[in-house]
């Protein structure tokens, strides 16, 4: 019985004049044999003791160099299959052919109306319209941001005015406090010397147990206690 390759689409047969070797499925090693079966990718394929795969489906590192590349290593698995490469290439070609070429956008050229001698607005294609719509969204966002910035600036101005008014109130209160402190200090000095200052036109001066009315022209009088 002439040995032939069990790989799908491979027509290699044993020929002593060709440098092709054939390798039996490792039936005694089930795990490795399953890998060979999966690599062959043949539906409902069950290898027998006569099934083999030719050396064309093994990479160079799968062979033992000391045996002139005739014996496989213990963990060698076939990985080279021409039909798989053809399918990949054909699949890529079909995908490229199926994809229609995108038309290049043609810039709109303004036309001149011969009747009035003015430039007419350019005609927009659907792609131009899509771009314009996107630009409108951007413009709306920009307008919204400007309004928001304007509102924030107005709030800042209001807060500055409130802060200014509060500072003015604080300064007035400080001046009032300083005035009261001066009056208290003057009162203490006057009390220490035996004199008391009263406003004119409202009080009478006590002098040697006798009351006398103050004239309207007198603003302040000193009384000896």
From Swiss-Prot:
The keyword Iron does not apply. InterPro entries: THAP1/10, THAP_Znf, THAP_Znf_sf. Its main location: nucleus. GO terms for biological process: regulation of transcription by RNA polymerase II. It holds the Pfam family THAP. Keywords: Cell cycle, Coiled coil, DNA-binding, Metal-binding, Nucleus, Transcription, Transcription regulation, Zinc, Zinc-finger. A zinc finger (THAP-type) spans 5-57. One of its GO terms (cellular component) is nucleus. The keyword Nucleus applies. GO terms for molecular function: DNA-binding transcription factor activity; RNA polymerase II cis-regulatory region sequence-specific DNA binding; sequence-specific DNA binding; zinc ion binding. Residues 139-194 form a coiled coil. DNA-binding transcription regulator that regulates endothelial cell proliferation and G1/S cell-cycle progression. Specifically binds the 5'-[AT]NTNN[GT]GGCA[AGT]-3' core DNA sequence and acts by modulating expression of pRB-E2F cell-cycle target genes. Belongs to the THAP1 family. This is THAP domain-containing protein 1 A. The lineage of its organism: Eukaryota, Metazoa, Chordata, Craniata, Vertebrata. The gene is thap1-a.
């Amino acid at each position: 019985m002439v040995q032939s390759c069990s790989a799908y689409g491979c027509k290699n047969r044993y020929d002593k004049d060709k440098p092709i070797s054939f390798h039996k499925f490792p039936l005694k090693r089930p795990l490795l044999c399953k890998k060979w079966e999966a690599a062959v990718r043949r539906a409902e394929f069950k290898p027998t003791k006569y099934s083999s795969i030719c050396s064309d489906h093994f990479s160079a590192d799968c062979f033992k160099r000391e045996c002139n590349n005739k014996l496989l290593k213990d963990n060698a698995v076939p990985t080279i299959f021409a039909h798989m490469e053809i399918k990949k290439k054909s699949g890529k070609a079909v995908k490229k052919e199926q994809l229609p070429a995108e038309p290049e956008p043609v810039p709109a050229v303004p036309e001149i109306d011969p009747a009035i001698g003015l430039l007419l607005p350019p005609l927009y294609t659907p792609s131009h319209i899509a771009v314009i719509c996107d630009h409108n969204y951007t413009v709306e966002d920009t307008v919204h941001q400007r309004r928001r910035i304007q509102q924030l600036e107005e709030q800042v101005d209001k807060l500055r005015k409130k802060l200014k008014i509060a500072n003015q109130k604080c300064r007035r209160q400080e001046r009032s406090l300083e005035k009261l402190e001066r009056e208290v200090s003057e009162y203490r000095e006057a009390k220490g010397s035996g004199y008391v200052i009263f406003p004119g036109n409202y009080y009478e001066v006590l002098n040697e147990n006798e009351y006398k009315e103050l004239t309207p022209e007198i603003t302040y009088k000193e009384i000896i206690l």
